């Protein structure tokens, strides 16, 4: 990491945003903070709340723990499927195309967590120092792409403070 960071700095790069993802080296707030402490504060997080949701973590609590380390944010939601997750837990080996049988699914923004939750999430990200863009990631296979994008954009417009 230190060689990579030195190379990035030589190239004029000021920040590296690592997206936390289950099963990788950086999958939580604590793993990002540990890597950052061992290397350089130019490393921060590309905060994807859906990835924390499917692990059972609280993205709002994570945003608070990551004060000053949030370099980018995704607008991406996930839904824990009632009944299925209750019996099988959150570990999901099935492909995303088998949405009817999965214990969780990526869904359009507002179709997992409600709009009040999203308002709080974006508010906390802002309070913790993030004032950048939000990237919409649309991976909802329970509706058409157009419906998912439109649903997500509508939800994001209602929840991101201007």
Q: Across the structure, where does each feature detected by a protein language model lie?
A:
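A generic secondary-structure signal
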Residues: 7, 34-35, 124, 155-159
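Alpha-helical elements of Rossmann-like donor-binding domains used by nucleotide-donor carbohydrate transfer enzymes
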Residues: 3, 31-34, 120, 151, ...
């Amino acid at each position: 990491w230190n060689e990579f960071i030195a190379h990035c700095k030589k190239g004029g790069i000021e920040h590296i945003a690592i997206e936390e993802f289950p099963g990788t080296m950086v999958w939580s707030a604590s793993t990002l903070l540990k890597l950052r402490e061992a290397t350089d504060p130019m490393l921060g997080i590309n905060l994807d709340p859906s990835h924390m949701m499917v692990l059972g973590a609280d993205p709002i609590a994570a945003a608070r723990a990551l004060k000053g380390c949030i370099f980018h944010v995704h607008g991406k939601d996930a839904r824990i499927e009632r009944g299925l997750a209750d019996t099988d837990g959150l570990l999901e080996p099935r492909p995303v195309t088998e949405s009817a049988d999965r214990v969780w699914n990526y869904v359009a923004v507002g179709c997992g967590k409600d709009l009040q939750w999203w308002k709080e999430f974006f508010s906390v990200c802002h309070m913790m120092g993030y004032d950048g863009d939000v990237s919409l990631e649309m991976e909802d296979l329970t509706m058409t792409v157009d419906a998912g994008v439109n649903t997500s954009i509508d939800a994001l417009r209602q929840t991101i403070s201007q």
